[in-house]
Amino acid sequence: MNANFNRRAFVQHTLLGSVGFLAGNSLLQAAEEPKRLNEIGLILGVLQKEMKTDWEGTLRQVAKMGYTHLEFNKYYGESAASFKNFMKEVGLKSLAGGLSISEMKKENLLKKAIDEALFLEKEYMICYWPWPDSGDDKKLDDFKKAADDLNQVGEVCNRMGIRFAMHNHDKEFVPVQGYQWGYEVLLKETDPAKVAMQLDLYWVTKGGGDPIQLLKDYPNRFELFHVKDVDKTPAKSYTCAGYGIIDFKKIFAQAKKTNIKYYIVEIDKAEYPMNCVQDSISYLKNLRY
């Protein structure tokens, strides 16, 4: 009797142990499962010509490719209401739009832009250019002044109910007193509650910055990526995502540990913009990281 009981207990214990081992392995495999992008945005400036020619057909095509969110400022001859309604009809969501800091410092212009953004149900108001001029030869005090301007705009955006973010170019990746890059001054001197960062991976790389190091050092500051590649020529010009030298897999893997929420395809200039938009999303959908 005891022998049978012991055998049954042993078998049950062994089975439970096996189930536990398999469950543990499944959890480990799930934890290690590579991630993929399920939602990918597009900045509509990529398709200026196409939008001017046939904005409805272009948006239908963009939605069919699998894009989910749009960053834009123009309505291409339509009212904001009709543009918004058509976007919803084809399954696209408004995400962001913006102005330069010079425009944003004009209170009436900023408030009008925010009102339009809120009507369109955008989440972000973007500062695309933090300088009152060309942005060349900036010193420490210039970066501190820019940070102060950004904080002020961010405060207005907060009051009106929209998140504010700054978009970088290569101009911010110059050494200044006490810092490897002037961009770090903007990160340290802006209030995270008022100012998020939209990290343009092309401009960071072209400027000599390190996207992965930035994500490691400031994991809570970045909320959006602009995704375009650096080509393989000495000029380091724009190219479609996946065509150039940027290691998006490594960057996105690091981004999993940060506040990054949105990945937005952009290409400032392309010979065949629609092809580039298609190739970029195809590459990003197939990327595992």
Region spans (language model):
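N-terminal secretory signal peptides and thylakoid transit peptides that target proteins
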Residues: 1-19, 25
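Active-site acidic/histidine proton-transfer and metal-coordination neighborhood
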Residues: 15-16, 69, 76, 102-197
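C-terminal segment of N-terminal export signals and the immediately downstream linker at the start
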Residues: 26-64
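Acidic (Asp/Glu)-rich catalytic clusters
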Residues: 33-35, 59-64, 78-95, 111-122, ...
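Structural preference for beta-strand elements that scaffold enzyme active sites
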Residues: 39-41, 69, 93-96, 124, ...
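Conserved, mostly hydrophobic/aromatic
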Residues: 42, 62, 70, 87, ...
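Acidic-and-aromatic substrate-binding clefts and catalytic sites of carbohydrate-active enzymes
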Residues: 48-53, 71-82, 100-109, 133-137, ...
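Acidic/histidine-rich catalytic cores of soluble enzymes
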Residues: 157-245
